[in-house]
Amino acid sequence: MRIMLLGAPGAGKGTQAQFIMEKYGVPQISTGDMLRAAVKAGTPLGLEAKKVMDAGQLVSDELIIGLVKERVAQDDCAAGFLLDGFPRTIPQADAMASSGIALDHVIEIDVPDEEIVKRMSGRRVHPGSGRVYHIVFNQPKVEGKDDVTGEDLAIRPDDEESTVRKRLDIYHEQTKPLVEYYGAVAAKGDVTYNKFDGTQSVATVSDEIVAVLS
């Protein structure tokens, strides 16, 4: 069961990824984790990646594909894997396909931009403990204060509305074209493509995903 998750930042992919991993016992493949592990292990690709990163440059698609290929060949991926956050672009998807990494299911979690902005820009964090609140969905007992310590809550830079909108712009420009790309692959019968309404409850989305994967 080789699964890829698609959706904008804040659409709830992380929550569903966790659910799929636990339900089906497949590992999540994150390119960030892979890079760190390869660098730590000192593999040839890891050393190459370290050189590039130490120079402050972006790791090339070829290098990332090489790491993904190495990773999916490991024993824990025998029953499948879950890709989240990769591929991000059509060239990456093409390179992945031509290197023989096939997918069975593409799952898109769809949430309108304004809902994502509401979700993410409403988050408030207690810096000392990492406790997370939300001005709409999970309010603190006293506005702007941590329930336990009474200290001030803060907005993470990542959750500032302008930052959220910037990330959404990048998603629409680079990653959203993959929706059409994998739609075309699915039309040829090479993969199943399913789109879920991410504004529903977490449990509802999980149930719908299970119905498709079973």
Swiss-Prot record:
EC number(s) on file: 2.7.4.3
Catalytic activity: AMP + ATP = 2 ADP
Chain sites annotated for binding AMP: 31, 36, 57-59, 85-88, 92, 156, 167
InterPro entries named among the record's database cross-references: Adenyl_kin_sub, Adenylat/UMP-CMP_kin, Adenylat_kinase_CS, Adenylate_kinase_lid-dom, P-loop_NTPase
Region (LID): 122-159
Subunit and partners: Monomer.
NCBIfam families: adk, PRK00279.1-1, PRK00279.1-2, PRK00279.1-3
PANTHER family on file: NUCLEOTIDE KINASE (PTHR23359)
Protein name from the UniProt record: Adenylate kinase
Lineage summary: Bacteria, Pseudomonadati, Pseudomonadota, Gammaproteobacteria, Alteromonadales
